[in-house]
Amino acid sequence: MTEPVSSTTRRGALGVGLGSLAPLILAPPLEAKAAGTARTPARFADPVWNREQAARLQAHTDGRQVYGRCSGVVHGIRPGEAGRALLGFEVFSTIRVVRRPDGNYDRMSKEVVLYTDPITGKALDEWDNPYTGERVRVVEIANDPYNWVIRDFVGPPALPGAETHNIPEPKDKKPFLLNWTDFSADTVVVTEGGHAWYPNQLDPAKWPRESAGPMVQASELFRYFINRADLENGSKTHLPHNGVWIRVTPWLPWMLMGTEPGHILYDGMFSSGDSLEHYKPAVIARIRERYPQYLEAPTKWYGPSVSSIEHYALEQKPAPARK
């Protein structure tokens, strides 16, 4: 949740589309089980219907914000040895969707990622790198804003520097179709994700200790678990959900691993909620202390949206050579 991967990630899938990924299952319309319960049949092959569900997944379609939470473990993976749990992490995000005149949605958010002690859960300011034996300063992620557009067609990739807000509708547009699975009697699943290979904004010549190399290789995968009754209830402005998130990415720059072989694996669980009670008290205390402006999602589009790596390059300074 820290930077763009491709047009088929969270950065793009709900805003750009998963039409390029073949759906696992396009199930027939789900049937209401309770007599007298009004249901709106699912239309998995309809791009406009998919756009509306994507917006409902992100926030309330009446303009109310939703809180997103993700908790998990940051693992280190190196060749020739077993992986190890390095850190815990907590994501705090506020998300709002606003319908545009063309019927599509501006999806607007702010997000913070805290790194925590995997045993105590306490947010860290410093971390002892077990690979190097060096104590390093932890750099939390704070993205304000991180926005994209949820359309009924596949838009441009949400990559650094790409214009995604105001684009003409392409003549040969590809329909926006989420990747649905009819999972169980009560649950449907949206799967999204992608793989990327793009230039590293931390030039290794300038950032020898922070940069893993001239290119970034990353993968990001999400699964949203949704109650099928909620999906077919057209009066619900938001689709509450739980999910799992996996991200494979180079070493975090503040770990000061340089071009050491290996990578990071984020392993997390996420959910949505309507109040701050959705979070651990310690997380809210940290947000109130350091990032109070993140408690409220944007109400209108502004930008640019800058990834965590871009923020690092703009706000940090290269670490001195290790003595």
Predicted regions and their residues:
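C-terminal segment of N-terminal export signals and the immediately downstream linker at the start
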Residues: A27-L57
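Edge beta-strand at a domain terminus
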Residues: N242-K323
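Domain-length functional cores that host ligand/cofactor binding and catalytic or interaction surfaces
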Residues: E192, Y198-P199, D203-A218, R223, ...
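Predominantly extracellular/secreted and cell-surface proteins with exposed
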Residues: A82-L231
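Short, solvent-exposed loop/hinge segments that bridge or flank secondary-structure elements
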Residues: P47-A59, G63, R69-P101, D125
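N-terminal secretory signal peptides
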Residues: M1-T9, L21-P23, K33
